[in-house]
Amino acid sequence: MVKVANKYAKALFDVSLDTNNLETINEELTVINEAVKDKIEQLRMVDSNPTQTAEQRRELINGVFTDINPYIKNMMYVLADNRHISLIADVFKAFQSLYNGHYNQDFATIESTYELSQEELDKIVKLVTQQTKLSKVIVDTKINPDLIGGFRVKVGTTVLDGSVRNDLVQLQRKFRRVN
């Protein structure tokens, strides 16, 4: 189903670019995703209910999403017609990926053993942008005492690990090779 969601996201992304609505559509999709992310199971039930017609599913969309961008509403109608309303979170993720790629940006999770100061965060973000060649990094911070010290950054599938825990694991591996 991820492939299906990717197709919807790509179509919406292309329309967003063509109509110069990329920012608006991204903002509205973010709000919609927040609103429905805990209701995916209920949306699956709507999708799989054989007694509910496409028109009834469209009415549901009209009732819930009153003042949304017409391109998003049209996509939601297509999702409803094809019994794919429950894919909206996957469509959002795929759209975000396209959006981030377009602006050469990505999300980064920075883990440390304590709350980092703004100066420390700025240094880490600078390092991450240099290492990943991204123009912008959107940061989420987490405190992880298991790291012992230092920090670990996850950007997509890339992990930059400057933690004491990682240093100890590497040292342990070297000792095992010697023995």
Curated annotation (Swiss-Prot):
Gene3D superfamilies assigned? N-terminal domain of the delta subunit of the F1F0-ATP synthase (1.10.520.20)
Regarding the membrane, this protein is recorded as: Peripheral membrane protein
* Record key words, sorted: ATP synthesis, Cell membrane, CF(1), Hydrogen ion transport, Ion transport, Membrane, Transport
Protein localization: Cell membrane
Q: Name one Pfam family in it.
A: OSCP
Q: Does the keyword Transferase apply?
A: no
**Listed GO CC annotations:** plasma membrane; proton-transporting ATP synthase complex
Q: Which InterPro entries match?
A: ATP_synth_OSCP/delta_N_sf (IPR026015), ATPase_OSCP/d_CS (IPR020781), ATPase_OSCP/dsu (IPR000711)
| The keyword RNA-binding is assigned to this record | no
**Gene Ontology BP annotations:** proton motive force-driven ATP synthesis
Q: What is its main location?
A: membrane
Tell me the domain of life. Answer: Bacteria
Among the GO molecular function terms of this UniProt record, one is:
proton-transporting ATP synthase activity, rotational mechanism
Question: Oligomeric state and partners?
Answer: F-type ATPases have 2 components, F(1) - the catalytic core - and F(0) - the membrane proton channel. F(1) has five subunits: alpha(3), beta(3), gamma(1), delta(1), epsilon(1). F(0) has three main subunits: a(1), b(2) and c(10-14). The alpha and beta chains form an alternating ring which encloses part of the gamma chain. F(1) is attached to F(0) by a central stalk formed by the gamma and epsilon chains, while a peripheral stalk is formed by the delta and b chains.
So what family is this one in?
Belongs to the ATPase delta chain family.
Q: What does this protein do?
A: F(1)F(0) ATP synthase produces ATP from ADP in the presence of a proton or sodium gradient. F-type ATPases consist of two structural domains, F(1) containing the extramembraneous catalytic core and F(0) containing the membrane proton channel, linked together by a central stalk and a peripheral stalk. During catalysis, ATP synthesis in the catalytic domain of F(1) is coupled via a rotary mechanism of the central stalk subunits to proton translocation. This protein is part of the stalk that links CF(0) to CF(1). It either transmits conformational changes from CF(0) to CF(1) or is implicated in proton conduction.
Which PANTHER family would you find in this protein's record?
A: ATP SYNTHASE DELTA CHAIN
Protein name per Swiss-Prot or TrEMBL: ATP synthase subunit delta
Organism, as annotated? Staphylococcus aureus (strain NCTC 8325 / PS 47)
- State the gene name recorded for this protein: atpH
